[in-house]
């Protein structure tokens, strides 16, 4: 069938998801994410129709609710990076979500210490260790895993928040983690989340 791919990217983190849709005419359009989210959240549940006109106006309609939003030029949308990240680890969504939730509270908000504003992922052959600290608190969680590649990376807390939020409710689903020295990519059945790392 036809599909609709939604992409959000702020040059630090990108999120991509693909959903089934009844596509009348293939194309692409760039819409303000906050406006779009606000409109969709106010609509009744059910089918949503999106129609984009050549004058740059996009109409979003569901039931009796209808909104119009000014679209932007797709060529101005930044291209997602080719991360070159290598497959590192596969882990159950429930395990990863639990590790994030047990450590995220200890991440520093102090931008003067960038390394403390993220979570350290230490991946060794047989275990994943997630560490967060802010100078006062230290949170460490370890879980046994079978890693494909060893690596130490610092992932921004904003990314970890999104990953935790977007992980499926099915705790038995698998998250594929790929990484290199610059990027990390989390891939689930529903989403791909890519992020720059803190150096």
Segments from the language model and where they lie:
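Structural preference for solvent-exposed beta-strand-turn elements
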Residues: 1-199
């Amino acid at each position: 069938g036809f599909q609709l791919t939604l992409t959000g990217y702020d040059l630090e983190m990108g999120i991509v998801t693909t959903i089934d849709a009844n596509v009348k005419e293939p194309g692409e359009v760039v819409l303000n994410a906050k406006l779009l989210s606000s409109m969709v959240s106010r609509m009744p549940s059910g089918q949503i129709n999106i129609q984009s006109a050549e004058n740059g106006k996009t109409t979003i309609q569901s039931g009796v609710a209808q909104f119009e939003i000014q679209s932007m030029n797709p060529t101005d949308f930044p291209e997602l990076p080719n991360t070159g990240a290598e497959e590192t680890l596969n882990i159950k969504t429930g395990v990863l979500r639990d590790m994030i939730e047990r450590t995220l509270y200890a991440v520093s908000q102090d931008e003067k210490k960038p390394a403390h504003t993220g979570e350290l992922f230490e991946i060794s052959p047989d275990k994943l260790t997630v560490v967060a600290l802010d100078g006062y608190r230290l949170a460490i969680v370890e879980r046994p895993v079978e890693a494909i590649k060893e690596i130490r990376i610092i992932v921004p807390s904003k990314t970890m928040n999104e990953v935790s939020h977007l992980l499926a409710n099915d705790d038995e689903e698998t998250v594929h983690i790929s990484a290199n020295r610059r990027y990390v990519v989390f891939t689930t059945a529903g989403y791909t989340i890519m992020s720059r790392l803190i150096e």
